[in-house]
Design a protein with these regions (language model features):
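An internal, acidic/charged active-site-proximal segment
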Residues: 45, 50-180
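Active-site-proximal, Lys/Arg-enriched surface segment
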Residues: 1-48, 160-170
Length: 180
């Protein structure tokens, strides 16, 4: 979806796994992803005539190109888990996995917490209807914020010049700490 044109356009999305030591950043893995689209008559935003006019070459089933084609159609969350798993098999160690709000989901939380590593997942919450099990019951993020304000648990950081609060909760049967 193009936020400039306010409509869907043909394109692809890039998914990158990088490692940083605070000074340097190294790309470990990447994959390109596409979507079929919502209109069944215009798969990937193309008419059948446009799809048939595209270059096509039959390749060996075990070729790298076919591997990339399978990745192109794969879910980005599934692929990100595979990328992290592959990096761990290659001996890459990390303390934190920083992800976008799109990837802060139950599947990735389960994967990271099921590893026998001392690592943390840092990601942004979606401020939607997702419920987290807290001492006060099953609450969504806006309700948790209101509750923290009423309990006067919100603090101010002079150094960062912002207000913050946190609460321990449970999500996807895993203990998490939520910061606001």
């Amino acid at each position: 979806y193009s936020h400039v044109l306010h409509r869907s356009i043909l394109g692809f999305k890039g998914l990158f796994l990088c490692h940083t030591d605070g000074k340097t950043q190294t790309m470990l893995d990447f994959s390109l992803h596409g979507e079929e689209g919502k209109n069944p008559e215009k798969i990937q935003g193309l008419t059948s005539k446009q799809r048939n006019a595209r270059f096509c070459k039959v390749r060996d089933e075990k070729s790298v190109v076919n591997t990339r084609i399978r990745e192109y159609k794969q879910s980005k969350i599934e692929r990100s888990i595979e990328m992290v798993r592959h990096a761990m098999k290659k001996g890459i160690r990390f303390d934190y996995l920083l992800v976008d709000s799109w990837f802060t989901c139950a599947d990735l939380i389960r994967f990271i917490t099921s590893r026998h590593l001392e690592c943390h997942l840092i990601g942004m919450l979606k401020m939607g209807k997702t419920r987290y099990r807290t001492e006060a019951g099953n609450l969504n993020a806006p309700v948790i914020i209101d509750r923290l304000k009423k309990e006067k648990s919100v603090r101010y950081s002079r150094k960062l010049n912002c207000y913050y609060a946190h609460m321990d909760a449970e999500y996807a049967n895993r203990k998490i700490r939520i910061f606001f």
